[in-house]
Amino acid sequence: MLYGKMNLGLLVSAAIFSAACSGGSKKTAMGTYAYDRAFFAERGIETLELTSEDGASRVLVIPAYQGRVMTSSAAGDTGDSYGWINYKFIEKGELNPQFNPVGGEERFWIGPEGGPNSFYFKKGDEQVYANWKVPAAIDTDTYDIRSQSGSSVCFTREFALRSASDRVFRIGVERTIELVDRDGAEQTLGAEIPGDVKFVAYRTNNVITNRGDESWTRDSGMPS
């Protein structure tokens, strides 16, 4: 059995030095973390949050979007929302048979996207955009929660993908998202974060496992 690992490491928001909004009147203003959380709640889309002890660092995750990090904040509910969200597409409430670009900040993806071992084209189809289709396993499937705490969550999912060479790959995914505290962020960055700087940081670890009977090789193809 072969295990494939993808460690995306630490993400510290590029807006680490941005000033946070304040005041009750700003709580649900567009562009804030609270606004985006409410946007999903109003549409019946389940979310879960990873939150620091002081409530300032927040990460919003959606199981139905493959355990995707949709957005984050360095200053709680009233802070800037750092993720890009495709409001218009989500508001339509319709699935696109080719690809559903809901947006987000960090997600699980799988390759190859092109070539004889691509998971995005059928055997015999010309590999052009019109024939490109994202597998449901990384587009519309809900990932299961294996474990969860206030600062981390672990998702799992098993599925089968058929390549452009008509070979079936049975894949298990374990995806962990973990909020990183100040000490952890400083260790990763190799630098001290000033006490007056608001920040949010998290790391993800994605492990793919061969659940089939045949080995994955360079010649026969393998997920990337």
Where is each model-derived feature located?
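Bacterial N-terminal signal peptides that target proteins for export
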Residues: 1-10
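Bacterial N-terminal signal peptides
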Residues: 9-18
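Surface-exposed acidic/polar loop and edge beta-strand patches at domain peripheries
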Residues: 22-203, 207, 211-224
